[in-house]
């Protein structure tokens, strides 16, 4: 039988999934991307503001990177996270990079030092 906490997380995820395709609110052992905003800059690049949630416990287990991934699975860019964010959850960091005009959507995924990949990802349109 599922406990109340798990049922609550399932209900929370279901409600959020129905309301928005650009956010997620599940926090687990893996690092979850919970929000992504992409804006075109004046020089034609894209600033990607990404919010990550992870239960960082210190240097032994923390969210250490997030990636911007093309539809073919290739990594367009990565934002390295140089330290744990134990007291700042969720946290937002930015990356500015060029995205080819033929790429209309990207997936943003987070990585942690123990589980690597596997948390919630977000697919977002590129505003060319």
What label would you give each PLM region?
Residues 2-14:
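Bacterial N-terminal signal peptides that target proteins for export
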Residues 20-25:
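N-terminal signal peptide c-region/cleavage motif recognized by signal peptidases
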Residues 65-69:
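Beta-strand signatures of extracellular beta-sandwich domains
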